[in-house]
């Protein structure tokens, strides 16, 4: 696992916490109290900080042949977050459905912020060297709205319609079809790196969020979540590092669908 532990891409297919995505200037106010976090992404805190959940050793317990439970206790003040947070994460492989199910539970003894997600990077074409681009992947996202970002990838506070913009994946489009358009949001993110506001049947329901089809292999991945949003990230900042089996990963050679709050 050296390629994971020593990876220059620290969030490669890891569990993200306490808080997935960026917190502006590493600060937030909760019930009138300001909390300062570790800065690790320009002026911001990203994915829980440099030693967030992705960098922690979790306790593991195999509950069944296809089920593993992980537990971690994040101490009060870790990376600046308040409260002792007990986290339980279960990975379950459903062979008949050809599905990987990830479940999270967290409890705290003090008011805090939590936004857990999985930062899986996918290339459905399979392993080769260099890893092929994901720009030919055909993506559909069940979302009529998204959250625009500024030049340092912080949400502006708006919730904008995707209709009539390159952000619209309500019908199938390849990733590369519009990714280089002179559209300010794609310039800000160096590609797609945005939260999509999912069309939910009801709050907390398990719904289809996104579909990704790789035409050369014929592989399709469906993403379901109970969360309100999903972050589409097209590997814009991958820099050619070496991963498993000697494969290298240049920019836009992997795609992420990060289920999350927003």
Q: What do these predicted ranges mean?
A:
Residues 1-262:
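An exposed, glycine/acidic-rich loop-and-rim segment of catalytic or binding clefts
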